Design a protein with these regions (language model features):
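Intein modules and their embedded homing endonuclease domains
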Residues: 1-119
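P-loop NTPase catalytic core of nucleic-acid-dependent motor ATPases
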Residues: 29-54, 95-208
Length: 208
């Protein structure tokens, strides 16, 4: 439905879109930062920028009826320029979780800030002991090795290699070692990389 001139948004004059004004108002409604060409909200990296394109389309479809694809592409590029941010700081004193921020001193806040990685799991101080997980570990590892694994998994939640340690799980096939990797994947998501030891053996530049 066509708008009357009185109903036109501030960023449209009847023929052209004022990109600067459009982007300013869009970012007020949808706060974002553009870091190294990728868009972030406080909830983390926007994996599918098509979502942003769809939001732009909703804004402009009331005043434009043709050339929408090109306009959306141009406005998305302009939004990235206006939302530019230098690289986000690496923070080793906190873990960004789905429902807020957990600090290494044991405190927690529901406040969120822009971060490189936000876990998709929520912090719950009253969560019950993971009995099934602990039972699995007791069947897989020696009792004294369980705290070591737990410590290493906790270490992986922080963006640091200060410990200069590597963990190797050695055993026969089919024992359940790979299930630990699945648990790590559910916690870390795309922040975790997997590969085979054969690639590391044959290519010293392979990701470990």
């Amino acid at each position: 439905m066509d708008m009357t001139p009185q109903a036109w948004p501030d960023w449209y004059d009847g023929r052209h879109i004022n990109e600067v004004l459009f982007c300013q108002q869009f970012l007020e409604k949808h706060p974002m930062k553009c870091v190294r060409g990728r868009l972030f909200t406080v909830d983390g990296l926007i994996e599918d920028e098509g979502q942003i394109g769809n939001l732009i389309l909703e804004e402009i479809s009331g005043v434009l009826t043709s050339g929408l694809s090109k306009v959306v592409t141009n406005l998305l590029a302009s939004i990235k320029l206006q939302a530019y941010s230098p690289p986000l700081p690496i923070e080793t004193d906190r873990i960004h979780v789905a429902n807020g921020t957990y600090f290494m001193d044991g405190s927690f806040t529901a406040d969120k800030s822009y971060c490189n990685n936000r876990l998709t799991v929520a912090y719950n101080p009253n969560a019950p002991a993971p009995k099934k997980w602990l039972q699995f570990l007791s069947e897989l590892l020696q009792p004294e090795d369980i705290p070591t694994l737990q410590e290493f998994l906790g270490y992986c939640l922080l963006p640091t290699t200060k410990g200069q340690k590597m963990l190797m799980l050695i055993g026969k096939g089919g024992e359940g070692k790979s299930r630990i990797g699945l648990v790590m994947r559910s916690l870390l998501g795309d922040s975790m990389n997997t590969t085979s030891i054969q690639k590391v053996e044959s290519n010293r530049f392979s990701r470990a």
